[in-house]
């Protein structure tokens, strides 16, 4: 009887016919508890290196090269103990290798199964690189693995566009606005395509701890609306606000309900992260856009909406901060898991300040709160967001310098652009509204910092997109010379 080794996603339904169930991922998979996983063992040491996983990114057209590199890694002595244990389990009977990868058949678990069953008996010393995929296949793979928070790109470009417009850099501001609108035009159909074509993956993200990242869709629409208000485009801004407010209402209730009602969630704090602050950012983004539009249209309804959303956002910020702080203090934080999303904590406070300054610009007769209450709250929140910046920078030094987590472009970098850009806008507008000149000056300098960060992240994004194609061409040329 031959060896029975198969690979499977850890989220799939378990069966009494399963043999030994072994998780072969380096980190615990999100959205599933240890009881639901029904593991016999967890051998994370046998997983690919972090660098190889980042390079692969579950792109099917890279699988052949990924397989070759991973097999080479498995030959290292550090994997010897874990491989020996897997071989022992294989000899005992049926073995199920579990992974959280979106496609188990094109994951390291499949390569491990091949290695354990002896299927990979021969492989060339220098295999030819896989041919580049067709355009349709490449786009399909990107959409299948689309990050739930992809609209963070639009949030970042939108707020920096607003910031540069304040500083008088109108051409650069318009260029970033166009980039943000183009991002909306590309990403929104991609979300719909993923929902229709890969519904299971989409729903898994929507009911898990990563669900708050979907609020970037609503926030991005409201950020664009606020930017268009500055140009006086009330009709288009109103359309973006309507879409953003509808998304905020749907997701603002749906995501917490999904988390509470889910039967597959982890009971620990492990899955709590900085993206949960997007719950508060969503409410404040509606407040900012609605208040700006109310000032131009004299709409009492929009003024009330802005005030109510501002109050809701403040309470959501306090609730989220409590949960995130409890998670940070109660559970150890791995350097690799301390993502740039931690900066959203500062961004959420900053956008709350901006919403407050926009409320202060509205007619006093429509205010349900004293203007001194709004102004005082804005100053307190600005002070807190300012205090957070050195702490976040120190955490970045701990992550990248002391714990040597490499700098690699990832979508999370846009979670850094948005808070920095928002802080610059907030500081300037708070100074202008309160007549504090030094705040206005500080805000102008912060805006330029946000612009530089945005340019750096765009350059890193383009480099990350181009690098695989350059590597494939270089490898192809090397193989032709060798032949």
Q: What are these regions, as identified by a protein language model?
A:
Residues 1-123:
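Residues lining hydrophobic/aromatic ligand-binding pockets adjacent to catalytic sites
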Residues 126-192:
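N-terminal signal-anchor module of multipass membrane proteins
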Residues 132-162, 198-226, 241, 260-289, ...:
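Juxtamembrane helix-loop boundaries in multi-pass membrane proteins
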Residues 156, 186-190, 327, 348-365, ...:
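C-terminal transmembrane-bundle signature of multipass membrane proteins
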Residues 162-173, 227-238, 290-305, 358-374, ...:
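Helix-coil boundary and interhelical linker segments in multi-pass alpha-helical membrane proteins
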Residues 169-244:
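Membrane helical hairpin/interfacial module
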Residues 174-188, 237-250, 304-319, 378-387, ...:
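Structural signature of hydrophobic alpha-helical transmembrane segments
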Residues 276-396:
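Generic multipass alpha-helical transmembrane bundles of integral membrane proteins
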């Amino acid at each position: 009887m031959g060896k029975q080794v198969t690979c499977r996603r850890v989220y799939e339904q378990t069966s009494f016919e399963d043999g030994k169930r072994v998780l072969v991922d380096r980190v615990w998979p999100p959205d599933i508890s240890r009881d639901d996983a029904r593991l016999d063992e967890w051998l994370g040491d046998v997983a690919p290196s972090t660098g190889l996983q980042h390079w692969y990114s579950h792109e099917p057209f890279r699988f052949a090269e990924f397989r070759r590199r991973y097999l080479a890694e498995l030959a290292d002595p550090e994997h010897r103990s874990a491989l020996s244990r897997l071989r022992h389990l294989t000899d005992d009977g049926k073995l199920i290798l579990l992974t959280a990868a979106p496609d188990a058949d094109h994951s390291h678990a499949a390569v491990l199964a091949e290695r354990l069953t002896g299927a990979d008996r021969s492989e060339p010393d220098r295999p030819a690189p896989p041919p580049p995929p067709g355009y349709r296949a490449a786009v399909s793979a990107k959409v299948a693995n689309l990050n739930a928070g992809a609209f963070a790109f639009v949030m970042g470009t939108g707020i920096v566009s607003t910031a540069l417009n304040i500083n008088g850099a109108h051409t650069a501001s318009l260029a970033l606005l166009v980039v943000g609108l183009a991002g909306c035009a590309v990403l929104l159909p991609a979300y719909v395509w993923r929902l229709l074509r890969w519904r299971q993956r989409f729903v898994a993200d929507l009911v898990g701890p990563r669900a708050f990242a979907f609020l970037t869709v609503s926030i991005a629409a409201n950020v664009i609306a606020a930017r268009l208000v500055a140009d006086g485009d009330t009709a288009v801004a109103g359309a973006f606000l309507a879409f953003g407010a509808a998304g905020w209402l749907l997701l603002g209730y749906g995501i917490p309900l999904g988390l509470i009602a889910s039967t597959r969630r982890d009971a620990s704090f492990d899955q709590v992260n900085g993206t949960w602050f997007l719950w508060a950012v969503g409410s404040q983004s509606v407040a900012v856009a609605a208040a700006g539009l109310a000032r131009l249209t004299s709409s009492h309804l929009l003024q009330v909406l802005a005030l109510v959303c501002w109050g809701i956002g403040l309470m959501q910020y306090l609730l989220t901060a409590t949960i995130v702080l409890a998670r940070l203090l109660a559970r150890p934080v791995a350097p690799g898991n301390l993502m740039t999303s931690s900066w959203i904590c500062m961004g959420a406070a900053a956008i709350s300040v901006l919403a407050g300054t926009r409320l202060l610009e509205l007619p006093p007769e429509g205010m349900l709160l004293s203007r001194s209450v709004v102004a005082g709250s804005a100053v307190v929140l600005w002070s807190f967001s300012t205090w957070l910046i050195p702490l976040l920078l120190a955490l970045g030094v701990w992550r990248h310098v002391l714990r040597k987590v490499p700098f690699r472009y990832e979508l999370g970098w846009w979670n850094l652009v948005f808070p920095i850009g928002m802080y610059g806008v907030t500081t300037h507008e708070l100074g202008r509204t309160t007549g504090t000149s030094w705040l206005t000056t500080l805000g102008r300098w912060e805006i330029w910092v946000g612009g530089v960060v945005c340019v750096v992240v765009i350059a890193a994004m383009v480099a990350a997109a181009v690098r695989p194609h350059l590597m494939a061409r270089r490898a192809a040329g090397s193989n032709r010379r060798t032949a």
